[in-house]
Each structure stands twice: as C-alpha cells, then as structure tokens.
A protein has these predicted regions:
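Short acidic-hydrophobic, aromatic-tinged amphipathic segments that line or gate anion-handling sites
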Residues: 59-60, 165-171
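PDZ peptide-recognition modules
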Residues: 149, 156-159, 168
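Small-residue-centered hinge/linker elements
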Residues: 1-139, 144-153, 179-194
C-alpha cells in the first residue's frame, strides 16, 4: 500500500531527457490522487527542483538553499596548450555548425557554436522553467527574471517569500509531517523505499 510519495533530494544528476521522463512519471503518479512531498536538507540543485516542483508541498531545511539559475555550459579550449607542447592537430571540418573539433583549433567558442549552444540550451531551459512555473502556479516570465537575478543560490527565507518552497522545516519535523500524513505513531519507524 502506497500512501504517497516522499522525495528527499541530495543532488540529482541526470540528463535533461531523463529528468523530463521522471517529471512526467511523477505527474502521472499525482493523478492517482495520492500526495507527493519533496524535501531538501541542504542544497537543492536545479534538477532536484525541477522534479520537486511536481510535489504538492516542497519543504526545505531553514538553512538550506536552491540553486536555480537557468542552464549554461563550458568547453575547455586547448589550442594554446597544444601549441605550447608542440602538438599539431590534423583537422578536417566541413560546415559552419560542426563544432566538435573547435577545442583543438580555437581559443574561444565560435559565434556559430555559441548560437547553436544558446539555442539548444534555451529550448531545454524554457521547457524546465515553464514546467516549474506551471507546477508552482507562477508566471514563467517572473520565474525567469528571478532566476536571472541570482548570483549564487537562493536562501531559504527568500524561497519561501517567492513561493518556491512551501515550508521551512528540519528533518525531524519533516518526519513528523510524514507520520501525520501516513498515520504512523511517533514511536514507530516510517517505511521508506529507496
């Protein structure tokens, strides 16, 4: 018997397609009428939050934070290093948007590669942002502005104010909430599956 779904986040690391599948699976589970609760003890990363947004309630440790800032990427460029050690790459490249060899032949990202990278990351971020906004009943544009304003991470009190989390609780308080939802006595252990 499953009463609900409790997700405790600790740094989900998965490809965007995998995250999307899990997000959709959580939405399907939610259609059963059973509850979903999400909890972040320390820092919640962007992937964690994307999945947590499906939950009926998002709980966060009062000293926790969320890293929610959009998507980006970084490519190491090695041309100067290769020149310094005397390695000459033999590169065959056809086409403007063929950028796999750029790290060996350039010192910085080409404009064509920047354009295509911004385009595909933009598509992924827009989907994540729109899902989070819909799940949390926020405006996509407002969420985007909020994410653009973050320098490091959002602290717990700001997240509560912006309605990105529902309640700030410590782990033992989270267990009390789960006991109440599952009708488990205080002296009994909760049954978790991981």
């Amino acid at each position: 018997r499953v009463d609900g779904f409790f997700i405790e986040f600790n740094g989900v690391s998965a490809a965007p397609a995998t995250l999307e599948k899990v997000h959709k699976a959580l939405k399907e589970f939610k259609k059963s009428g059973k509850w979903i609760a999400a909890y972040g003890h320390e820092g919640i990363n962007q992937a964690d939050y994307y999945l947590a947004s499906v939950a009926d309630s998002i709980y966060l440790n009062p000293v926790g934070s969320v890293d929610l800032h959009g998507l980006g990427g970084m490519t190491p460029y090695m041309k100067k290093l290769l020149d310094k050690v005397g390695v000459e790459m033999q590169i065959v490249r056809v086409g403007t948007f063929k950028s796999a060899v750029e790290p060996y032949m350039l010192d910085d990202m080409s404009e064509a590669n920047r354009l295509q990278t911004e385009h595909y990351l933009g598509i992924i971020w827009n989907e994540m942002r729109d899902c989070i906004a819909k799940d949390r009943k926020l405006q996509s544009a407002a969420l985007n502005t909020l994410c653009d304003s973050v320098v490091v991470t959002f602290k717990a009190d700001r997240l509560l104010k912006e309605k990105l989390v529902d309640k700030l609780v410590y782990r033992n308080q989270m267990e009390d909430i789960l006991r109440a939802r599952t009708k488990v006595d205080k002296d009994e252990d909760l049954n978790f599956v991981s």
